[in-house]
Amino acid sequence: FGVLSQAREDEADNDQENETVKEVMLHIPFQTAPSPDLDGDGIPDALESDGDATDPNSDWDNDGVSDIQEQAIGSNPYDSDEDGTGADFVANAYPNKFDLDSIYGYVDEEQTFNLVVSRSNYFLRGLDPNSNFEEAQEYYSNHDFSSFIGETLFNGEVTIDNEEQLFRDNEDDPETDVDESLEVTSRLAPGIHVPLDNAFFQENILDKEGQTELLSQSNFRNFLRGIHLSGTNADDLMFLLDLTQANITITYEYDDYDSEADEIVTAERDFVLSFLSGNAQSGISGNAVNVFENEMFPNPDIANALDNGENASRIYVKGGQTLAEIRLFDEMENGGSDIINQIKQNNWVINEANLTF
């Protein structure tokens, strides 16, 4: 993970690089569809009132500078304290806002839920052994993974935020008039962004350097099989997550030799574990499974009426759990077979059919 392989580190003439985890972050972005901006002022229409959505001279933050002007100078249209005239102003250094239409039940920016991230010990194989490994393995939403949940990596509250996260990694150059430390070097889309347990990744990633667990991709996938996500206090929320952009970033430090200064210095690197790759056009590589825990109908009369082999007088449907079948033409009742035969004999083409309750 440093400059030298573990085998080189273990040689007598070389010092250990002492790779140490500094930070581990899990990022799973929300799916965000392109949001229209009819007036071209840089603010999505979904975040503006009906009148402002078509008015480029609207002023979202009421700072006296129109949204279209703030877009031109690169000032923050959502912050009334920034209008581009400050002495320390840096253009385009503010977080963009997004319309989070991929979250069902999302009400406001202060909404929270509790998230538990754990190690998964269940191996999500890609091919089905029952088909001689010629077909993809199928997984169903009622599968029980509870006995395969390992160590807890995070357990805490997550706040839903529709803003990007900004990173400023530059150091200020004292010889310039601009404060480079205020410049945005990278942006992170809105989503779940939480720290994970450093000790776990120190033990299971960095300390495994040179061992069989990291010898090949197949060995690593069998060793670290995945993560398990579960939420509480989120009964009214449903998320669409973009797992193709999700990752775990391990930031670590190690001892490096500076040949010019002839000394050991502390260097820093990132190691990124991605979840899925690809897209709908090229295909998705990797496996992810979503499961649902559904309670049965609370009314015992409804539960007893389901799947009892008898024709029901009523139809009960529960999303994600039950299936209702309706027989339209019973062969023995209401002349059903005669109706079907008449349609066939006359070669009638049915353009439209409606079922009315």
What spans do the regions from the language model cover?
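Proprotein-processing/basic-patch segments
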Residues: E157, D161-N308, I315-V317, W348, ...
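Beta-strand-rich interaction/scaffold domains
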Residues: A33-P36, G40, G74, D81-I192
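Short loop/turn segments at secondary-structure transitions that flank enzyme active sites
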Residues: F30-P34, G74, N121-G126, Y254-D256, ...
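Solvent-exposed, acidic/flexible segments
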Residues: N14-V21, G40, S58, N62, ...
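Structured segments of extracytoplasmic/periplasmic soluble domains
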Residues: L4-A7, H27, Q31, A46-D50, ...
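Extracellular calcium-associated, cysteine-rich motifs in secreted modular proteins
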Residues: P36-V90
